[in-house]
Amino acid sequence: MDKVKIALQYMLPKHLLSRLVGKLAAAEAGTLTTAAIKWFIKQYKIDMSEAAQSEPQAYKSFNDFFTRALKPGIRPINQHTNIMVHPVDGAVSQLGPIKEGRIFQAKGHHYSSLTLLGDQVQDAKRFEGGDFATIYLAPKDYHRIHMPIKGTLSKMTYVPGELFSVNPLTARHVPGLFARNERVVAIFETEHGPLAMVLVGATIVASIETVWAGTITPPTGKQVFTWEYPTVGPDAITLDKGDEMGRFKLGSTVVMLFAKDAIDTFAEGVEAEAVTRMGQAFANLNNPK
């Protein structure tokens, strides 16, 4: 059965399907929208008591519901200076060292950090010998993405690609999954070196948004797009630890890359398959150089 599910993903018109679902999710269809939201809440056992708007009818579209805000203070941010926090609610897929430019995906599968970053050679060099973490956001999860530490945006790259599902089953069977799918790479300068936040698209993920540029995907065409940003002066974009940096419409995966020696140890309990809650301790950082 697993092989059949994977084979179907290769056969499906994933981009067409994603565009169609995106239009439906953006539709403001009144009682139909509310009914769809109620079904989704029941199907995935979503705790709406955490949402800023807990009533399904408060959302005009399914996208509004899916990117819902949480109540203030429901995810307190660990403010310890040398603590990096979880950027999302989800589950750790994998984490560990970046060795010779290779990142572990699942048993028997690695992929290239260079490919993940859109073949940006200088960017990949900055993370050689560092660490990575991959976090999967299930349909039930809160889908806004926050900063794990304070950082100033220096570069953003849009990389076109496939739209395979990014669930654990697909990660085990599709080689180079996260470096094959459509993605947005945001690089920040921090006190602990560069930080890459890679927002990976997936089947029926209608779009990826950032707080500084709005909707990024999908643009017209199949080429890589790169934007560079000033890191000093009035136009610099600096986000504090815990600030929202982006969101998924219909969920996906975040891959984080850290510079060599930035991380001392991952926090207690942070390991593959561990549940994550945005704002809780993710890693202990070394002192800034």
Curated annotation (Swiss-Prot):
The record marks 251-252 as: Cleavage (non-hydrolytic). Its EC number is 4.1.1.65. Its main location: membrane. Its cofactor is pyruvate. The modification Pyruvic acid (Ser) is found at residue 252. Pathway: Phospholipid metabolism; phosphatidylethanolamine biosynthesis; phosphatidylethanolamine from CDP-diacylglycerol: step 2/2. Disulfide bonds: none annotated. InterPro entries: PS_Dcarbxylase, PSD-B, PSD_type1_pro. Heterodimer of a large membrane-associated beta subunit and a small pyruvoyl-containing alpha subunit. Catalyzes the formation of phosphatidylethanolamine (PtdEtn) from phosphatidylserine (PtdSer). Belongs to the phosphatidylserine decarboxylase family. PSD-B subfamily. Prokaryotic type I sub-subfamily. This is Phosphatidylserine decarboxylase proenzyme. It comes from Shewanella putrefaciens (strain CN-32 / ATCC BAA-453). The lineage of its organism: Bacteria, Pseudomonadati, Pseudomonadota, Gammaproteobacteria, Alteromonadales.
